[in-house]
Amino acid sequence: MLDATPKEIVERKALRINPAKTCQPVGAMYAALGIHNCLPHSHGSQGCCSYHRTVLSRHFKEPAMASTSSFTEGASVFGGGSNIKTAVKNIFSLYNPDIIAVHTTCLSETLGDDLPTYISQMEDAGSIPEGKLVIHTNTPSYVGSHVTGFANMVQGIVNYLSENTGAKNGKINVIPGFVGPADMREIKRLFEAMDIPYIMFPDTSGVLDGPTTGEYKMYPEGGTKIEDLKDTGNSDLTLSLGSYASDLGAKTLEKKCKVPFKTLRTPIGVSATDEFIMALSEATGKEVPASIEEERGQLIDLMIDAQQYLQGKKVALLGDPDEIIALSKFIIELGAIPKYVVTGTPGMKFQKEIDAMLAEAGIEGSKVKVEGDFFDVHQWIKNEGVDLLISNTYGKFIAREENIPFVRFGFPIMDRYGHYYNPKVGYKGAIRLVEEITNVILDKIERECTEEDFEVVR
C-alpha cells in the first residue's frame, strides 16, 4: 500500500501527508460529552458534525450524540445566527438536555459568527429555558488539532460555569487531558484509593464506555454534573494532567477563581505515575496506601522480566503530545530507545521536552518533529529501521509495509475492539503497555525464527 514511499527525503513546508492529528471540533465534542446531560453542538454544516461524530464512534464503538446548525448556502453567505437560534429552540424542545456545548467549525469561524452575542440574544428572547444552559468555545479546524479543541472546550466550561463562592470545598480538581474513559476511571480509582475528594472535568467515563442494558438513554449516567463544574471554583488545587490538553483550563480557572494549579505529565509509566501519586500525597498529607505500592511493585517486576527483549530496541512513536511525552519517558525506563518521536499538534515545548529527556538519558541520533506526519516517519524508517512502531490505527500501513511490530496507542484506534475498556495510565495501565509491547516483539521473533529456536518458554 505504501510501497511507493520514496527513501529520498525532501523538505516539505506547506504539505502534510497522512497527518498525525485530526481537527479541533473532534476534541471539543469529546470534552463536551464529558458533561452530564450535555448535547454537544457543532456550529457549521451537517457534514462536519457527521465526520466528528463518526471519528468518535469508530474509536469508542459507541454512538457519539451531537447536533448541528446545518449550514447551507444562505448561512454560508449571511452567517449562522438564525440557524443556531432555531437549533437551540429545537434541541431543548425535542431532546431536553441540561446544557448545550457549542463549538465552531472552519466555516463559522471564517464567517466570524459572534457566538457570545447569539447566546445573549437567545437568553434575552427566552429561547433558553429556565435552569438550562448554553456555553461555547471557538474551535477553528485550520488551527491546532483535536487536542487544542479539547483544551478550548475545557476553557469554555470554566469561563461559563466555574464559580468562587468563597466557601472552600476541600476538593482537588483534576483535568485528565485527552485520554480515554478507562483512563479517567483509573485516575478516579487512584484518588479514591487515597481517600481524596475530587472533581474530574470533563469525565467521559460512563458516557462512551457504558454497558448495554437493553434500555436506550440519550444521556448516559456518566459525565461531570453541572453543580460540580460550578464548584470547581471552590477547590483547593487543580491538577493539570498534560500541558497541551489541560493547562489552558487550569490557567483560566486560576485567573477567574484563584484556584492554584500544578501541571503534571500524563501519568503513563513509572516516573510520571510516581509524580502524580506524590503530588496527591503532598497536596493532602495522605499516605500512599499499600495497595498502590503493590501495583507499582508489580509493574517493576514485569519490567525486569521483559527487559531482555526490550533493552536497546529502537522505537518510533507518533501521537498526541501529552501522551507521547509520557510514553517516550516510559520507553526509556524500559531500556529501549525513542528513535523517532512525532506529534501532529503544534507547540515547540514538545520538542524541548523530548530533547531534554533524550539528553538526560544519553541517547543520541533520535529525530523529533512537531507538526510531523506518518510520511515523515515512514521515510525515516526506510533510511534507518526500528524494532517497534507505536501509534494510532494509521500506523498499521507502515508496520505492514516494513514488517515492524506494531502497538496501537492513542486516538483514533478504529480497527480493534476493547481498548477503550483498558487504561494506559497509572501503574495498572503501564502493566498493560509492557505486556502489549513485549508480546508484539515476541510474536515477530517466533514468526520468523528457525524451527530450532521456536521455544515453548520465553
UniProtKB/Swiss-Prot annotation:
The keyword Transmembrane helix does not apply. Pfam families: Oxidored_nitro. Binds 1 [8Fe-7S] cluster per heterodimer. GO terms for biological process: nitrogen fixation. InterPro entries: ChlB/BchB/BchZ, Nase/OxRdtase_comp1, Nase_comp1_CS, Nase_Mo-Fe_CF_bsu. Its cofactor is [8Fe-7S] cluster. [8Fe-7S] cluster binds at C23, C48, C106, S141. GO terms for cellular component: molybdenum-iron nitrogenase complex. It is an enzyme of class 1 (oxidoreductase). Gene3D superfamilies: Nitrogenase molybdenum iron protein domain, Nitrogenase Molybdenum-iron Protein, subunit B, domain 4. Its EC number is 1.18.6.1. One of its GO terms (molecular function) is nitrogenase activity. Keywords: ATP-binding, Iron, Iron-sulfur, Metal-binding, Nitrogen fixation, Nucleotide-binding, Oxidoreductase. The keyword Protein transport does not apply. It catalyses: N2 + 8 reduced [2Fe-2S]-[ferredoxin] + 16 ATP + 16 H2O = H2 + 8 oxidized [2Fe-2S]-[ferredoxin] + 2 NH4(+) + 16 ADP + 16 phosphate + 6 H(+). Belongs to the NifD/NifK/NifE/NifN family. This molybdenum-iron protein is part of the nitrogenase complex that catalyzes the key enzymatic reactions in nitrogen fixation. Tetramer of two alpha and two beta chains. Forms complex with the iron protein (nitrogenase component 2). NCBIfam families: nifK. This is Nitrogenase molybdenum-iron protein beta chain. It comes from Clostridium pasteurianum. The gene is nifK.
